[in-house]
Structure formats: C-alpha cells, structure tokens
A protein has these predicted regions:
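Extracellular glycan-recognition regions
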Residues: 1-187
Length: 187
C-alpha cells in the first residue's frame, strides 16, 4: 500500500492504521464551492476488476467537515469517498461521488457510533456503498456509477478541511472478491 498525500503523522501495524491529518486537507471538485481540492490523505492499493473492500474505523470528529472512511479512485477526476463526515455538529454517513464534478449525500446519525464498518463493492460500472453500525448487518447507503474497465485504487482516507490534527483509526482493511451483485439478497 502507498500514500496519496501522506499525513504528517501516522502509524501502521498488524491491520491497524492511525493517522493525524494535515492542515485543510480535502477531496472535492467544483460543485457549489467552485474549487478543486486533492489534498486529502489516502492509503491505497491498486485493484483490477470487480472487488469488495471493507474497513472498520473511528475518528475524533470535532470540526466542520472532519471525515474518515474509504475511497475508490480511478484518477483525480473520477472517484468516490464514503464514511463519516462531521457537519452541523453531528456525525453523518456521507458519500461523495466525483465524475468531473463532485456530488454529496449525507444521512445524519442521531446516535453517533463508536465505530463504523464500511463496505464498498465494485461490479463493472457500479460501486455499492454499505455500512454497519455496531453489528454484522450491512445496509445499502448508495449505488453509484464509476467508469468501468479501469484499474482503481482503494483504501482508507481521511480529511480535515477546516483544521489540522483530526485523528482517525482504521482496523481490518481488506480487499477481496466481490460480494454478490444482488442488491436485495439476504445475508
């Protein structure tokens, strides 16, 4: 695995990654704000074809837009990041899909979890985003398009657009064969 924008401080050992973000880091392209940011921290590996990636993570969310989760990246103009983002004083499940321009969807969490498990599955032109809060049952959060037939980088990401020093911890990151394409099959 390698870094796209290594953070100023990080440690990794035995399936455990902890990082502290640099100042005003983010991934975003154009929409609403009119700027491009490609300064977030992304610890990734390259994957060919279809796959499923899973990670458990937590963060010390305190400032506007503090965020942690998983990213799938084809290049600087085509990517998806998903996880927790702190906005309006609340943790939100968050997905940003970028195909030249970024979009953003959020779901507020009234009971902030200690840890979130996130699962991203790529099947051709689709990336399915699923989450689990405190148990083994995954729920779908988003189904998004990313151009098929291109290698992708996938791995943990974290950003802090309004500050430095956001601490995020990731555990048990795994990439393997894709789960079933069926969106509504029981697990």
């Amino acid at each position: 695995m390698k870094w796209h924008n290594p953070p100023p401080r990080w440690t990794a050992s035995e399936g455990h990654l902890t990082l502290e973000t640099g100042d005003q880091t983010d991934f975003w392209r154009e929409t609403h704000y009119g700027f491009i940011r490609d300064s977030g921290h992304f610890f990734h590996q390259e994957v060919e074809g279809d796959f499923t990636a899973t990670v458990r993570f937590s963060g010390e969310y305190r400032a506007l837009y503090d965020q942690a989760g998983l990213m799938v990246r084809l290049d600087e103009r085509h990517w998806l990041k998903a996880g927790i983002e702190y906005t309006d004083g609340v943790q939100h499940l968050s997905v940003v899909v970028t195909r030249e321009f970024s979009d953003w969807s959020v779901l507020p969490l009234t009971q902030p979890p200690d840890e979130v498990t996130l699962r991203l599955s790529r099947h051709g032109d689709a990336v399915r985003v699923e989450y689990a809060l405190g148990g083994p049952a995954f729920r779908m959060l988003r189904l998004a398009y990313l151009p098929p037939g291109r290698p992708a980088s996938v791995g943990p990401m974290a950003c802090s657009p309004q500050r430095s020093g956001f601490v995020a911890t990731f555990r048990d990151f795994q990439v393997g064969p894709p789960i079933s394409r069926e969106l509504h099959s029981p697990e």
